[in-house]
């Protein structure tokens, strides 16, 4: 093998995404064979067999000195692979095959499998941040409130994709009751502007990346390389405000709404009245009433298009 050829592993989650996505996923080995530059990359392909397996596999490939590990799946698979590559020189590539693909969309990675593979032939490596909510890692967003309640309901839904998600939202919107939250950020020896605020909010999102997925950009100006999170506080609002807010969400202008307040922090503590629903990258998790959220700067490397600017 030529010394110039780099080792790359594709970790495939066979069950993420819609039925259509799963059909495309079965074509990935053939697409890799046809489209990957084999003078540049020497590929290995493996499927996950259980929850958390992608982390184990990614860590193993990093220990073996692989140059890159590609997550083939949704945001959950991407998060698992990232966790296995923290603080290593092995870079993560992504072939987005989930229902939301928020992290990949933030990075400008195509959702078409063939185009995502071709990107690997003309890629560069950048270092990005990740977040921690207590002891749980997130790469895109975490949060509490209405979206977390939706995530909890959506997790039990047999149907995936945007339309199934919207249906879940509509079923919950009339019954949801917001609570009051307190957010406290210390100065961290001058590293951030301190604050201590209380708000009755519809939802609060702590954003490392700019979106939940499907280009729903809850934090349009979030930057994966700035060492800080964007804290998006959406106030409770009338039902008539829902459509304008949705329009702003998908046009990247929600931060301009008078119903939204944006804060920025490297670390803060969320105090809730109860241990209500909480999500990590769209997946519901059990959390205590108090949650400390922090951003870990430049924790892992990702492969992006050569023309992608730092963001």
Where do the language-model regions lie?
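ATP/NTP phosphate-donor binding region
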Residues: 1-69, 309-311
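Catalytic core of DAGKc-family lipid kinases
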Residues: 48, 87-91, 95-203
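N-terminal glycine-rich "phosphate-gripper" loop used for MgATP/nucleotide binding
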Residues: 71-75
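Short Gly/Thr/Asp-enriched flexible loops that form oxyanion-binding sites at enzyme active sites
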Residues: 76-90
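Glycine-rich phosphate/pyrophosphate-binding beta-alpha loops
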Residues: 143, 147, 205-221, 284
